[in-house]
Amino acid sequence: MKIEDIVQKEVKDISCYEVKTILEQKSQEKIAKMNLNENFAIPNDTIQKILVDTCRSIDVRAYPPPRGSLACKAISSFLGFSESEVSVANGADEIMDLLMKVFVRKGSKVITVEPSFPMYTFFTQLYGGSTVPVLLRPDFSLDVDAVLEKADKNTKLLFVCSPNNPTGNQFRESDIKRLLQEFNGVVVVDEAYVDFAQGSVINWVRDYDNLAVLRSFSKAFGLAGLRLGYLVSSTSVVDYIQRVVGPFNVNSVTQQTIALALEKWSYFKEQIKYVVNEREWLMKNLQQIDGVTPYPSDTNFILFKVTKSDLTSAIVTERMEARDVLVKDRGHLTLLENCIRVTVGNRNMNEKFVSALKESLEE
């Protein structure tokens, strides 16, 4: 018997999602890690203190509260929703996986607006569905008519990342509202970056049964390593999600830390303001550098285009890495030729990035 003979076709057809890691021979302190939109603007000491309080209050010999119920209770109370309208999981990625388990099978279709987060397509293909990509307009706005034209009776889900990764812009509420009213399926609005933007559609959950809002603690709270994502939706959607989730899917440390972090919201809100201010500082500096053009951002990252004629985004990204600054080359994506995404860091990181970028453009 060959193992590949009994492996599902959908698994054979996908490849492992690659993530750039820091070279072991270089210390993390030396590297400006600005490629994965993690929040290093929050001092690590602050996070460590919360973790210490967590470890003093839990017993990891016991199984965690089932289905993330401790975190679910804290989140629902914080947002003003009932616990029956919230589902939590190991990162937003697992929420996507759970949505696919509920809604997608072979023959199902999932619409994505591109360019956007690639994991929507990854999970769709894993469950035998097909992704129907719809391009954003040249100004990165939603083409609602094009989305609705692509939908048919087999279309189960529509993913809209707002603010969008990697373009950085938040979509118009009027466009999202029209999709909710006219799309005959579940509209998943990924608000992982919403804390850095001006508005949210999360309260629309009370008005639209087909709205599911996806959020994360990785960005605004700087807790990417703990892996906690959550979904706010109608009780019917959440009920189906709960049916397919494992009983102990979120560990005790993560759940308790999330509860404690939410109690310190005023602190994290100030850190969000700091990131937004640093984003504006970074934007102004990028606008003053010949050879690049930055795009407006409602997130904790900025997308910019390499416009110097003899360079590509891949070359600049490689040169930046040689200077111990990691950024994300997005130049291979549709509409984003020669574009690079950089995470907003603390001032030291941002200054190092600006210096490395200038050198990389002139090398």
Model-derived segments and spans:
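N-terminal "arm"/small-domain region of PLP-dependent enzymes with the aminotransferase-like
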Residues: 1-62
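PLP-dependent aminotransferase class I/II
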Residues: 44, 67, 210-288, 293-295
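Phosphate-binding glycine-rich loop
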Residues: 69-109
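Short acidic capping loops at alpha-helix termini that bridge into adjacent secondary structure
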Residues: 82-86, 106-109, 154, 191, ...
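PLP-dependent aminotransferase-like
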Residues: 102-160
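Active-site phosphate-binding strand-loop segment of PLP-dependent enzymes
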Residues: 138-195
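Conserved PLP-binding catalytic core of the aspartate aminotransferase-like
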Residues: 276, 289-323, 340
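PLP-dependent enzyme catalytic core of the Aspartate aminotransferase-like
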Residues: 309, 322-323, 332-363
